Swiss-Prot record:
This is Protein C-ets-1. Pfam families: Ets, Ets1_N_flank, SAM_PNT. There is a cross-link at residues 15, 227 (Glycyl lysine isopeptide (Lys-Gly) (interchain with G-Cter in SUMO)). Its main location: nucleus. GO terms for cellular component: cytoplasm; nucleus; transcription regulator complex. There is a cross-link at residues 8, 15, 138 (Glycyl lysine isopeptide (Lys-Gly) (interchain with G-Cter in SUMO2)). It comes from Rattus norvegicus.
């Protein structure tokens, strides 16, 4: 980027051009065109970037991308990233990490967002995303009608290689009675990610109930629109994966970079966003921080329980519910703390430090330090301890995922609808793991 700058208090950017990240120097390099980022030049760079970002407005209008990024579909996010890559000549961007809708993207938080892209590249993208959010305007419309979303000219070759086809609009089903919907059910089950805002605006979410979480052909979800606003097919455009129907994600960043209480979505047989992060791993990948292996060529069918039952290599040394497999099954992306706890709880070799009490979904951390150590190892956080882990657990309280059992030390209970998600009753899992009721009971 080249800019003629008046260094007087009335700072003015006269001209901005396309930015090539390779032009940005390291502290030991000399560059006459672009100054080093110092506290005094930070605002200057921010203004220059903002001026360059203005070029995205034409792209928004051309593709019908809403101005509020929280209302973006996965296709809109994809178009935005591709625009930025071309506009700034960005290097090393892993497009798979951005396969989510705008609500999920905005809900990540800065720290988690920056993990999606290389150094400085993430800062560029985050700066633009923040600017777009602060504008806080309604989605772009033409004559009061929601626009169609033509395919970006940047996307055809790359995303076809990942099996992603043109967006398919799925019409809303008939409204159903919402009175039996709980927040935890809503949190752990498939939802239409296109209409959701970030978790900061959770009170504005529509209530959702799943007609059949195991539909093998089409996505069928009932919507309850708030403020008498009925969702239209345009609001529910979702990418379709030709190599398998995959799950979606909205996420929530907590203290110590916990990937806590991400909104979980469809099983393999469901259709939504977050396409290329859906995985069916081998057991060899369960102790890896990396994403598990890619989907097989065939389309997996059935429930998570069916998947586990069909595993020929399942034995007493392997967890019944491996966290990586559950993350892939739900499409939640990186392994979440609650998924990791389920892995430990369904691994007989871990019963010395964490186990079910025998009372439903209640469990006890017999050695909380060992649980924290293993979580830190899994997330590559060597300073992890129980104090930090418990802070992560507390983020689940308000979400009705996990609650602390009153009067019992290190005892917690899953209060969400795990049975519908996993296909197991707690009694079935207890029998498989030879769990005996806690003597304290």
């Amino acid at each position: 980027m080249k800019a003629a700058v008046d260094l007087k208090p009335t700072l003015t950017i006269i001209k901005t051009e396309k930015v090539d990240l390779e032009l940005f120097p390291s502290p030991d390099m000399e560059c006459a065109d672009v100054p080093l980022l110092t506290p005094s030049s930070k605002e200057m760079m921010s203004q220059a970037l903002k001026a360059t970002f203005s070029g995205f407005t034409k792209e928004q209008q051309r593709l019908g991308i809403p101005k509020d990024p929280r209302q973006w579909t996965e296709t809109h996010v994809r178009d935005w990233v591709m625009w930025a890559v071309n506009e700034f000549s960005l290097k090393g961007v892993d497009f798979q990490k951005f396969c989510m809708n705008g609500a999920a993207l905005c809900a990540l938080g800065k720290e988690c967002f920056l993990e999606l892209a290389p150094d400085f590249v993430g800062d560029i993208l985050w700066e633009h995303l923040e600017i777009l959010q602060k504008e806080d305007v309604k989605p772009y419309q033409v004559n009061g009608v929601n626009p169609t979303y033509p395919e970006s000219r940047y996307t055809s070759d790359y995303f076809i290689s990942y099996g992603i086809e043109h967006a398919q609009c799925v019409p809303p089903s008939e409204f159903s009675e919402p009175s039996f919907i709980t927040e935890s059910y809503q949190t752990l089950h498939p939802i239409s990610s296109e209409e959701l805002l970030s978790l900061k605006y959770e009170n504005d979410y529509p209530s959702v109930i799943l007609r059949d979480p195991l539909q093998t052909d089409t996505l069928q979800t009932d919507y309850f629109a708030i403020k008498q606003e009925v969702l239209t097919p345009d609001n529910m455009c979702m990418g379709r994966a030709s190599r398998g129907k995959l799950g979606g994600q909205d996420s929530f960043e907590s203290i110590e970079s916990y990937d806590s209480c991400d909104r979980l979505t469809q099983s393999w047989s469901s259709q939504s966003s977050f396409n290329s992060l859906q995985r069916v791993p081998s057991y060899d990948s369960f102790d890896s921080e990396d994403y598990p292996a890619a989907l097989p060529n065939h389309k997996p069918k059935g429930t998570f329980k069916d998947y586990v039952r069909d595993r020929a290599d399942l034995n007493k040394d392997k967890p019944v519910i491996p966290a990586a497999a559950l993350a892939g099954y739900t499409g939640s992306g990186p392994i979440q703390l609650w998924q990791f706890l389920l892995e430990l709880l369904t691994d007989k070799s871990c019963q010395s430090f964490i186990s079910w009490t025998g009372d439903g979904w209640e469990f006890k951390l017999s050695d909380p330090d060992e649980v924290a150590r293993r979580w830190g190892k899994r997330k590559n956080k060597p300073k992890m301890n129980y104090e930090k882990l418990s802070r992560g657990l507390r983020y689940y309280y308000d979400k009705n995922i996990i609650h602390k059992t009153a009067g019992k030390r290190y005892v917690y209970r899953f209060v969400c609808d795990l049975q519908s998600l996993l296909g197991y009753t707690p009694e079935e899992l207890h029998a498989m793991l030879d769990v005996k009721p806690d003597a304290d009971e």
